[in-house]
């Protein structure tokens, strides 16, 4: 089963806003799991994931800010 979250062309501003909202939701989820966890190894893995998400967002923003015209975004959840 697939759930289509995003599919379309967006202005650079809107593309950045959409990506920022989604990535921040994922970061908030990971932070919540860190707060619930007593497992140090699990917390460290989640902290690494947060840093990776932050870097991905930074890189994507930088890329989008240097593009002209509309940006195509596509994202889906694939349930297996």
PLM region spans:
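Extended, charge-rich alpha-helical interface modules
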Residues: 1-80
């Amino acid at each position: 089963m697939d759930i289509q979250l995003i599919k379309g062309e967006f202005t650079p501003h809107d593309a950045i806003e959409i990506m920022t909202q989604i990535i921040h939701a994922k970061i908030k989820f990971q932070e919540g799991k860190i707060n619930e966890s007593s497992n140090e190894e699990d917390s460290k893995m989640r902290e690494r994931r947060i840093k990776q998400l932050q870097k991905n967002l930074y890189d994507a923003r930088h890329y989008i800010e240097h593009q002209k015209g509309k940006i195509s975004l596509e994202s889906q959840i694939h349930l297996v």
